[in-house]
Structures are given as structure tokens and as C-alpha cells.
Amino acid sequence: MIVLKDICKKLGENQVLDHISFHISPNENVGIIGLNAAGKTTLLNVIAGVLKPDSGFIRVGGSENVFEDKKMLRKLSYVSGMRHQLWEDLRVKDSFENGIKMYHLDEKRAKARLEELEELFEIKDLVHMRPQKLSLGERMRCELVYGLLAEPQILMLDEAMIGLDVSVKYKIMEYFQEYRKKRQSTILFTSHNLMEVENLCDRIILLDKGTVIFDGSVERIMKEFAPLYRMKMKTEGVLPDFDDLPLEKYGSCRMELK
């Protein structure tokens, strides 16, 4: 269970989180969406204990101070496209081995699990390389595997699908769905891609300028907000690369081809 009540956080002079309140039950997949500077990453940092709120109440899995609760930290994993966990000067394989030791995992069980994850995330050929030699998508696959090593009860994914090929991305999201069912875990997921959120999440929290302006089902947000945003495009011949659309400006969109 994650409980937030009247959470406020300033960064400099900016009020990034403004009286945020909600609770998340075990076995929920929750998408946290919003335009750039809406407060998504700061919110996850507060939940993870990386940042302390200026005011308000927070409880994560029974703990009111996640950052100082070692048992709770082992149950929580935070994978970010902007904040990396792998050691830069070590091979990916060495980072995994360090993670097994750091989390005090059963070595035999952890290595068997690691072998399974390396196969699923298609990184067997990458583990002998250093992170700086990897492409963004390759690195994110390795970061995701590292984040899953300790079989976390709460998994936070902050733009963690960036750079991934579509086929790999949706295979990974299927895995997360199965993982949640098997572990009765909680997944918090931020993305600019609403289609990703639809595929992974049951519930959406929409932030705007640090406040919650919507909290409900995927179906409800589509019904209430989708009619407000439309984009018309004309093209001939080969379709443009829609991955290059400026989503940070327009947000995600649905596309209908006629």
C-alpha cells in the first residue's frame, strides 16, 4: 500500500508538487502521466525516498521513511530513463553480481533468475560490455533487468521504455503484467506514450503543474479527455516516422488511418 496525503515539494522557487493525495493498493498497475514539468519524476522520487517532501504524509508499504528503512528499500525498485543504476566503469555482468551481493540475495536463486531475465530481455550478448558502449535501448533493457534482480514488491518505472524496439517493448510489458499477477506487486509507470500506459496500467493519475487533475480508469480518461485533443495530418506515399513527433509539446495521440 502506498499512501500520500497533502504532499508538497518545492525545487528552488518552483512548487513542483502541490498538495498531492492518493493511495495505491497492492496488485495495482498505475500510470502517472502529464506533460513535461508536471511533477511525475519528482513524485516518484518522493515515493522512493530519494527526495523528502516539504510537507504532508507518506507511507510506503508500512514505512514512513523509505530511504532509511533497509528492509523496505529491498522491496522497492526504481528504474529511470534519466537516472541510471549500472556502474559505468564495470561490465553489465559485474553490476548484476554487485547487485546480488548488495541486496543479500540467495546466489543460486538469483543467478537462475538472472539467466531467465537475460533471455527474455535479449541482453545475453550485452552483459560483457560496459554501459557507455551500449545504445540507449540496450542500456535500458539492462537497467530493467538490474531493477528486477531483487524481485521487488513495488516497481517504479520512470520513462523506462525509452529507446526500446516496439517488439521488445511489448514483450517486456507482457512480462510486467505476469510479474504483477505472480507477485501481487505494485507497478508505477510514467510515460509520454499513452499507448504504453494503456497496455500496462489499470488506473491513471494525471498531473498538471504539480496537482492531480484526474485519477481513474484508462477507459474513463479516454472518454473524458481524448475528444479534447485532435491532430490532422496529410501525407502522400510513405508515412512519416511518428516516433519523431514532438510528444513533449503535444502529448500522446491516437492515430486513425483512412
Across the structure, where does each feature detected by a protein language model lie?
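Helix-to-loop junction immediately C-terminal to a conserved catalytic motif
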Residues: 48
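Conserved ABC transporter NBD signature motif
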Residues: 56-67, 72-73
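Q-loop/switch helix immediately C-terminal to the Walker
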Residues: 88-102
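Conserved ABC ATPase "signature" region
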Residues: 97, 101, 108-126
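Conserved ABC ATPase signature
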Residues: 130-134
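ABC transporter nucleotide-binding domain
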Residues: 173-188, 192-257
